[in-house]
């Protein structure tokens, strides 16, 4: 069992009770989280735009210890975008090696999950805690967004506020 499996095959939530479930497009990879996200944000950086083929990335941030995989550990693919290498060197991107769906960004302590992968019912009822609190790297935006959320040129509170 490698380091990733040791970390995510178990979780440090006392009496782990799944609160939310996420899965890739094909369903081969599934994971649970036992808490609400600590934050959620929209990233407009060029790297996120290119990796997701979209103008932005919406991420809900969890402590890694609150994440537990229930299927598909053997179908995970890792990519370190800073080094441009398909390896699990943190921080890295995590995707399904079958359908190619992006699952999360894995940091050293945090798991940045993509809320659109979670099962919020049909029609979806996204919990308030998953809704974004700000935009980061808004200076690289493809188009303006008038949503009244704070907008930062780079990272939150350590770059210029743009709106």
For every predicted segment, state its role:
Residues 1-21, 28-163:
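A short Gly-Trp-Pro
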